[in-house]
Amino acid sequence: MLLVAVNALVGGTLGQERTILPLLAGQVFQLDLYTSALTYILAFGVAKAATNYFAGTFSDRYGRKPVLVTGWLVALPVPFMLIFGPSWGWIVAANVVLGISQGLTWSTTVMMKMDLVGPERRGLAMGLNEAAGYLGVAGTALATGYIASTYGLRPGPFLLGAAFIAVGLGLSVLTVRETRHHAGTEAAAHVPVHSGTHAGLSSREVFTLTSFRDRSLSSVSQAGMVNNLNDGLAWGLFPVLFAAAGLSIERIGVLAAVYPAVWGAGQLITGALSDRIGRKPLIVAGMIVQAAALAMVAVGADFGIWLAAVILLGAGTAMVYPTLLAAIGDVAHPHWRARSVGIYRLWRDGGFAVGALLSGVIADAYGIPAAVGVVAALTAASGILVAVRMRRADHISAG
């Protein structure tokens, strides 16, 4: 539960940007092209994706707690860069730093919970972890929308992020304990789920297995990437779309908060559900639901339709997000599970960068609804690929 609280603070640190930065790009820095405005998500996604990989490797080598504390230390300058940044380049640089911090902190809370709970409740643990993180994102997105409407886009919203970082660092240093030895205990009784997933693999072999060779691991990796591709679109272009339709900052803040709120709260149910019915059905259904929600955003034109769409998008993402992480934990051997999680998160958070670039280019050329429609089609295709390629019974029955 301490790690759940820490990850809520990790999510809050990210949530300080969700409502504000898309508006900051246009209203303060006068960025007209969507591709230019989305550079901060591209920078965040590349930095976080790369750091996820190293977080897994460093956690295996040095332990989980040192990586977690380092992530909080890296985050310290972010709110001040966002508050005082005189140019858009400062905002992009702040998101590089934030991406590094998020890669270290969020990845480590995932690994530590996997270490602690064992295989039978892995979905429940991932649901708790991701629910805490995205409820933190949602609550902060909503709070910063109201703060900005009263006090302006800077500095008020980012002072909340500074407080989260201070508390998260204090908790991680003073109260969090190392969990790596639990993975060693689990490894002694581990029964491989698939052939080729034995203990003695090099980092290169783990990368190729997770990314390409294993049908289940690679299916999960591509689905994670597409999921965050559409989240990058939602983060960067939804507030711009809503503002262009005449919605107030308060209403934009509500829509920006409802999506991760449903996503976060829903994972309290879907994570545990995947322990019972398996990972594959929830992943496939979740990707299809997301695609339908994105299609609603593309054709919608008012607050009511968009509210229904973001609720549906949050529900679909809740079905997928903890389930994908649990599926990685099911297949990966405890000796290299942290590395496999890091590689999955490399692909998944690389989706932020791909989504920002792809949706920005399409939006510049054809408008935001066209960009949303293309991403909806990609999301549906990803779900179909999981249905065809992923093995069916990937929840652990053998300890």
What kind of feature is each model-predicted range?
Residues 156-173, 372-387:
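Symmetry-related core transmembrane helices of the 12-TM Major Facilitator Superfamily/SLC fold
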Residues 63, 84-89, 278, 299-301:
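Helix-breaking motifs and short loop linkers at transmembrane-helix boundaries and internal kinks
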Residues 66-80, 281-296:
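Structural signature of the two symmetry-related core transmembrane helices
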Residues 51-63, 267-278, 363:
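Helix-to-loop junctions at the C-terminal end of transmembrane segments
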Residues 1-45, 218-219, 223, 227-245:
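Helix-loop boundary and gating motifs at the non-cytosolic
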Residues 96-134, 327:
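Cytoplasmic helix-loop-helix junction between adjacent transmembrane helices
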Residues 1, 181-220:
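Juxtamembrane intracellular "pre-TM" segments in multi-pass secondary transporters
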Residues 44-53, 138, 260-268, 352-353:
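Residue-level signature of mid-helix packing/kink "hotspots" within the transmembrane helices
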